[in-house]
Amino acid sequence: MAIPINPLSDKSVAYRSVVDFYSARSSFAIPRKVILCLTDRCNMRCNMCTLQHTTVEKKELEVSDWVEAIEELSWAKPTFLLFGGEPLLYENVGSLLDFLCQRDCPVEVVTNGFFLEKYVDKLIAVDARVTVSMSGVDKVHDNIKNCPNSFQRIAGFFDFLSRHAPAYFSNVGVNCVMTPDNIDGIEELIHFLSSYPIHSLSLQHMQFSSVALRNMTDQFWKKAFGASCTLVLEPNVSYEYDDAYLKRIKLLSSVVKKWSGKMNISFFPALDSPDIDNYYSDRRHFLCGKDNVCLKPWRVPTICPNGDISNCSGMVLGNIKKQSFWKIWNGEKNNSFRDSLISHGSFPFCTRCCSFYEKYDLSGKLNVDE
């Protein structure tokens, strides 16, 4: 399937305008959020997960390497997002949280919730904003996560906060990926969460790809950048997104409205009814987010467990063990990538990536409340 890309399109013009607005078009871009992927390891194997997690020990950065990277970046006061795998499985995550507390930078943690009680004191000390992945209530959650008692571990953490640190709930959000496995249990999850004063609940549409899209992206990557794309967005379980499922997703809007006065609930991406149909279509998902602008290559670097720095899924710029962050992030390879993105407006797989749908406030920071 050919992708219509016009370098002189309105999207390209819009890109130049937005990137200029955020003063990011120069060759020196300052990150607003830095994703620290501490480990690829995870104690769960979620049905909808597209990351190739493993329980096998792999070479990971020493905590001293992370400290050095944070020190190099901390003058810019970005938000440091601890990610994985399961970031709380990283052997020295406690020491890293202690160091981040000293640097007085905003901290976020995305976690499956299994180890939250173990690190709750350190998370509170650093005032971390925590996003917990939940898929439902009781066995629905456990079965999707393929991890017995995982729901009870999260419920235990919430009960702990209720007794000992209720004010910290304002830092706690829940993300629920919608799938055919849990779509009929979403309201039960909302009802459960309504017992706790959490900050927000995000109902996320699946991230998924296909062999055809991966091959198309790889061909584009080789032509544009002379390298293969390592992007893999294939969940552990292959789902069918038929009309009946899409109808059930759309019906959730009325459920969310019913709870709107009691909880802060949103969909991500925020799609209207026609775009829901497009998003789940292999042929029409390119029509989604036609006015969207992705600033990840300027604003949100990812540092992988082995030290690789990525600006976009499937693109490695360099490694912090071999070169300084700033030389990599604002080097020739990333600036060339940014120019290509501005010219094309988007790449074939962009509408399948969550970064494509992120919103930004006027400072260029991610608007996490949307």
Residue ranges and their predicted role:
Residues M1-I30, R284-E370:
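Flexible mid-to-C-terminal extensions adjoining Fe-S/redox cofactors in radical SAM and related proteins
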Residues A2-R129:
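Conserved alpha-helical substructure of the radical SAM core
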Residues T55, E86, G136, Q207, ...:
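Flexible, active-site-proximal loop/turn residues at the rims of small-molecule/cofactor binding pockets
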Residues K58-E60, D142-N146, G314:
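Short, solvent-exposed loop/turn segments at secondary-structure boundaries
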Residues I70, G94-D98, V120-I124, A155-F158, ...:
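Short amphipathic alpha-helical segments and helix-helix/interface helices
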Residues E72-W75, I124-A125, P166, S195, ...:
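Alpha-helix termination/capping residues and helix-transition junctions
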Residues N92, H205, S313-V316:
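Short clusters of small/polar residues that mark proteolytic maturation junctions
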Residues R129-S135, K139-N306, S310, I320:
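Radical SAM enzyme [4Fe-4S]-AdoMet core and its adjacent flexible, acidic
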